[in-house]
Curated annotation (Swiss-Prot):
<dbReference type="Pfam" id="PF00763">
    <property type="entry name" value="THF_DHG_CYH"/>
</dbReference>
<dbReference type="GO" id="GO:0006164">
    <property type="term" value="P:purine nucleotide biosynthetic process"/>
</dbReference>
<keyword id="KW-0560">Oxidoreductase</keyword>
<dbReference type="InterPro" id="IPR020631">
    <property type="entry name" value="THF_DH/CycHdrlase_NAD-bd_dom"/>
</dbReference>
<keyword id="KW-0521">NADP</keyword>
<comment type="function">
    <text>Catalyzes the oxidation of 5,10-methylenetetrahydrofolate to 5,10-methenyltetrahydrofolate and then the hydrolysis of 5,10-methenyltetrahydrofolate to 10-formyltetrahydrofolate.</text>
</comment>
<dbReference type="GO" id="GO:0004477">
    <property type="term" value="F:methenyltetrahydrofolate cyclohydrolase activity"/>
</dbReference>
<feature type="binding site">
    <location>
        <begin position="166"/>
        <end position="168"/>
    </location>
    <ligand>
        <name>NADP(+)</name>
    </ligand>
</feature>
<protein>
    <recommendedName>
        <fullName>Bifunctional protein FolD</fullName>
        <ecNumber>1.5.1.5</ecNumber>
        <ecNumber>3.5.4.9</ecNumber>
    </recommendedName>
</protein>
<keyword id="KW-0486">Methionine biosynthesis</keyword>
<dbReference type="InterPro" id="IPR000672">
    <property type="entry name" value="THF_DH/CycHdrlase"/>
</dbReference>
<keyword id="KW-0658">Purine biosynthesis</keyword>
<keyword id="KW-0511">Multifunctional enzyme</keyword>
<dbReference type="GO" id="GO:0004488">
    <property type="term" value="F:methylenetetrahydrofolate dehydrogenase (NADP+) activity"/>
</dbReference>
<dbReference type="Pfam" id="PF02882">
    <property type="entry name" value="THF_DHG_CYH_C"/>
</dbReference>
<comment type="pathway">
    <text>One-carbon metabolism; tetrahydrofolate interconversion.</text>
</comment>
<dbReference type="GO" id="GO:0000105">
    <property type="term" value="P:L-histidine biosynthetic process"/>
</dbReference>
Length: 284
């Protein structure tokens, strides 16, 4: 058996087309386009690539894209003041601060400074709390993008056994909440988990989000399972490698995401969805 490929790039392109159409309809009706402000601190090459991709996606669908590229030595006070300025700007529907930040910046305070209704990354404690209470508003982009991918398989997710490998605040923990909301029975694994292969071998859905190349062996995958590889590591030759042994896992899984081209495009597509939602449902 060779798994079906979950083509996040193609699915995300369709989402972006629908968003672009909706933005054009808004402009035709005399309404303003959604506005997204993206803040980049410093010149980390990986962060610059991520931010460039997000800004390009915004412009392609017709959003108003605001770029704030700040020097690495920007103070906490100045960064918070900029966020306050954007919070008060009625033409800005979403504020995104590219993580990670410098060691002198308190990232949690920065996230909490963003108005919850403009937190299109879905990281604010208010938005995580609503997701916990099964009242989602603006949802974390990567986890919700994964749910969108899973829905495209046509499976009924209710009652399925799901394993999340990785317990970060960005992906692992909100991923657990999204899967619970979808009706899955969820196990979350982390650095202290013993015998990692055991829960994985029983899982109908495996979401890997660690950033450790080939952590998950293909032979661990339950036949017919769905494998979502969120993690990626850039190798010395420039190629990207996921957390899962792709080729061997592909021989056992029913569905699997590639790296790259799987989850990454869905994260950006969900960011655009969140920004449009904030515009139409929270700011009008």
């Amino acid at each position: 058996m060779s798994a079906n490929i979950l083509d996040g790039k193609a699915i995300a392109a369709n989402i972006r087309r629908n968003i672009k159409k909706r933005v054009q309809e808004r402009i035709t009706a005399g309404l303003r386009p959604p506005g997204l402000a993206v803040i980049l601190l410093g010149s980390d090459p990986a962060s610059q690539v991520y931010v460039r991709n997000k800004r390009r996606a915004c412009e392609e669908v017709g959003f108003k894209s605001l770029a704030y590229d700040l020097p690495a030595d920007t103070t906490q006070a100045n960064l918070l003041a900029l966020i306050d300025q954007l919070n008060a700007d009625s033409t800005v529907d979403g504020i995104l601060v590219q993580l990670p930040l410098g060691g002198h910046i308190d990232a949690e305070q920065v996230i909490e400074q963003i108005r919850p209704d403009k937190d299109v990354d879905g990281f604010h404690p208010y938005n995580i709390g609503r997701l916990t209470l099964r009242l989602p508003l603006l949802r974390p982009c990567t986890p919700h993008g994964v749910i969108t991918l899973l829905r495209t398989t046509g499976q009924d997710l209710r009652g399925l056994e799901a394993v999340v490998v990785g317990a970060s605040n960005i992906v692992g923990r909100p991923m657990m909440l999204e899967l619970l909301l979808a009706g899955c029975t969820v196990t979350i694994c982390h650095r202290w988990t013993r015998d990692l292969h055991k829960p994985i071998s029983e899982a109908d859905i495996v979401v890997a989000a660690v950033g450790k190349p080939h952590l998950i062996q293909g032979k661990w995958i339950k036949p017919g399972a769905t494998v979502i590889d969120v993690g990626f590591t850039r190798q010395p030759d420039g190629t990207l490698t996921g957390d899962v042994e792709f080729e061997s896992a592909r021989q056992r899984a029913l569905w699997i995401t590639p790296v790259p081209g799987g989850v990454g495009p869905m994260t950006i597509a969900t960011l655009l969805q969140n920004t449009l939602y904030a515009t139409e449902k929270l700011h009008e």
